[in-house]
């Protein structure tokens, strides 16, 4: 039943009106007015990505590392992770899952390379979005990217990933994406001692994580959000 609910909600998402907005740190994101929901925090898309996924996720690991992103979206998290790979000379195998890819014209409205002062890597951001879906692309010697076009409930990986960026739409608009069914799949996908990070901090989300076996800790959230979760697959 949960899987049918996810598909139904995602079909609705495909039809929802979308607009590009500028967040408080100057970086852009996509907003769904009917849901009052954004792809990233309105308080700062780049600030949120760096705080949640880099500072509290990627920084825990040395190379090589395998990452699963739940909600590839605009590609911001992948791009920032690529920049970190270059900075640290860290080899990263990155998999981004997205049921409904962002349109090409929307991608043109994303100003991440400029806001990150990384215009020399703007071609990398473009390369990520031009790469074929469901095929592994060697973005550079350090960074490979596989964009998988699938629903989250269709994920059936087993102990492949070191780190998961859980960046689905919020519980308020898509609670089915934060269920025990989905988190069981996340737990199964992680290697022993793997880590999942997310911007979320609702009690119901924490309970779902704990129910499937995660050890969960609450951390200080990004600007505009008091708290966030980091979960470990401890063995």
Regions found by a protein language model. Name each.
Residues 75-79:
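Glycine-rich SAM-binding Motif I of class I
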Residues 177-192:
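A short glycine-rich, Lys/Arg-flanked "PGG" loop and its adjoining helix->strand segment in the class I
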Residues 2-65, 83-116:
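Rossmann-like AdoMet
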Residues 145-147, 160-168:
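Short SAM/SAH-binding signature in class I
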Residues 71-73, 98:
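Conserved S-adenosyl-L-methionine
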Residues 193-200:
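Conserved beta-strand signature within the Rossmann-like core of class I S-adenosyl-L-methionine
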Residues 212-235:
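Core SAM-dependent methyltransferase catalytic element
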Residues 108-157:
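S-adenosyl-L-methionine
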């Amino acid at each position: 039943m949960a899987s049918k609910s996810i598909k139904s909600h995602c079909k609705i998402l495909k039809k929802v009106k979308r607009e590009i907005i500028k967040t408080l740190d100057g970086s852009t994101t996509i907003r769904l007015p009917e849901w009052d929901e954004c792809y990233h925090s309105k308080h700062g898309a780049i600030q949120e990505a760096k705080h949640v996924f880099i500072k509290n996720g990627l920084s825990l690991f040395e190379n090589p590392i395998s990452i699963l992103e739940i909600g590839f979206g605009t590609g911001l998290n992948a791009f920032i992770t690529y920049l970190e790979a270059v900075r640290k000379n860290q080899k990263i195998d990155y998999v981004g899952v997205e049921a409904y890819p962002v349109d090409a014209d929307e991608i043109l409205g994303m100003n991440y390379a400029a806001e990150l002062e990384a215009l020399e890597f703007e071609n990398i951001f473009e390369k990520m979005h031009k790469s074929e879906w469901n095929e592994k692309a060697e973005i550079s010697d350090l960074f490979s990217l596989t964009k998988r076009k699938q629903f989250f409930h269709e994920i059936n990986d087993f102990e492949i990933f070191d780190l998961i960026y859980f960046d689905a739409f919020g519980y308020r608009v898509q609670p089915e994406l934060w269920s025990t069914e989905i988190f069981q799949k996340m737990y199964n996908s992680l290697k022993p001692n793997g880590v999942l990070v997310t911007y979320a901090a609702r009690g119901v989300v924490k309970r779902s994580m704990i129910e499937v076996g995660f050890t969960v800790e609450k951390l200080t959230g990004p600007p505009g959000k008091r708290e966030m979760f980091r979960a470990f697959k401890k063995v």
